[in-house]
Amino acid sequence: MSVTKKDVEYVAELARLSFNEDEKESLASDLNQILNYVEKLQELDTEKEDIIVNPYYIENKFREDEITPSIKLEEVLENAPKTLEEYVLVPTIIREQ
């Protein structure tokens, strides 16, 4: 499988990105190099290798999930530029085509 300029254009459109022609060619080339590397990795024979999820034993250092006091909804709404009932209104970013 190889990535074409048309593939880059399609994904860019989905992500709402724009690239010039040189960037499209460069991205297609970079993505093809990545795919070639992944293909090489898939050729490796790992049947005799031990499964290692994590080579180091790392203990979870995160705190426990506990409910803590937070800012009140009224305070949030007072600081928002626009609100509707208990929602903060934000500018539209994505519109239907």
UniProtKB/Swiss-Prot annotation:
Bilayer-crossing regions: none
E.C. no: 6.3.5.-
Signal peptide residues on this chain, from the entry's feature table: none
Record key words, sorted: ATP-binding, Ligase, Nucleotide-binding, Protein biosynthesis
Cited Gene3D superfamilies: Glu-tRNAGln amidotransferase C subunit, N-terminal domain (1.10.20.60)
GO BP: glutaminyl-tRNAGln biosynthesis via transamidation; regulation of translational fidelity; translation
Catalysed conversion reaction: L-glutamyl-tRNA(Gln) + L-glutamine + ATP + H2O = L-glutaminyl-tRNA(Gln) + L-glutamate + ADP + phosphate + H(+); L-aspartyl-tRNA(Asn) + L-glutamine + ATP + H2O = L-asparaginyl-tRNA(Asn) + L-glutamate + ADP + phosphate + 2 H(+)
Alphabetized HAMAP family for the sequence: GatC
Subunit structure: Heterotrimer of A, B and C subunits.
Family: Belongs to the GatC family.
Protein name: Aspartyl/glutamyl-tRNA(Asn/Gln) amidotransferase subunit C
Organism, as annotated: Clostridium botulinum (strain Eklund 17B / Type B)
